[in-house]
Amino acid sequence: MRDVARTEARELAIKDELFAHLVERITEEVRERERHLREQRGAPLVLHAHDSQLYSVENDKTGRQATIAFDGLQHIIEVRGEGIHYTFEVIISDKGRPSFTMCKDGELVPGTVTQGKMLTAVHLAIDSITDLPAPI
């Protein structure tokens, strides 16, 4: 019984550490993307850091918002934009390694989920609230 508790505690510590890294990296990406679209492409965007668990980027002209929410207890990251909804969860695989699941519009997406896919989802969500043409 102690071995099970020890394994669960170790897995929780791994998930907590990976989740904290993802929160930091994704938050940085949200800030960079909002700044890039505002300064380089003229999008009327405003970043709102509600707290460390919720960030939103708002189109100041239309009021449309993209939100990025972090649930540290469940190790879930939710990314929403106009017509965009992704959910990522930090899990421990059967082999005891940290991994991720990804759902798009509530449906589990098969295949390998990477940090790059999470950052792409952030870009898509923020880009979805602008009226800018897609870059060539």
Task: Give the residues covered by each predicted segment.
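Intrinsic disorder/low-complexity polar-acidic segments
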Residues: 49-136
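Contiguous, amphipathic alpha-helical segments that mediate oligomerization or scaffolding
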Residues: 2-47
